[in-house]
């Protein structure tokens, strides 16, 4: 079993507003996939994939994380808005327990995301 906790910086317009999203893999399968991965030619890319709700993370008040926020533009991050990034607070790879914790206080003005995953 493996869990990916994505906390890194927002990577411009090709990235999605999904800090602290997780994907879970087990027995050679993705059992908790990122539902926000569609090709640019697919109409779901603009209406679904580019919104925080399409990912396995948290949204506040139904809004997407910055820099998307209230914007419907797929290039919201290209306008030089607030940099969004998470910080790895804990990483432990012990024999019996593996754990990671990350926080992000730049995805929402006045909000803080905090996520811990353990195996």
Regions found by a protein language model. Give the residues of each.
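Catalytic and substrate-binding regions of extracellular carbohydrate-active enzymes
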Residues: 1-119
């Amino acid at each position: 079993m493996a869990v990916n906790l994505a906390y890194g910086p927002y990577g411009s317009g090709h990235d999605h507003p999904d800090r602290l999203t997780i994907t879970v893999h087990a027995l050679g399968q993705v059992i908790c996939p990122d539902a926000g991965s569609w090709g640019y030619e697919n109409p779901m890319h603009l209406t679904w994939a580019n919104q925080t709700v399409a990912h396995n993370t948290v949204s506040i008040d139904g809004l997407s994380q910055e820099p998307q926020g209230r914007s419907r533009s797929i290039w919201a991050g290209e306008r030089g808005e607030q940099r969004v990034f998470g910080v790895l607070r804990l990483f432990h790879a012990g024999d019996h327990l593996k754990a990671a914790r990350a926080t992000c206080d730049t995805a929402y003005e006045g909000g803080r995301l905090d996520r811990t995953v353990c195996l």
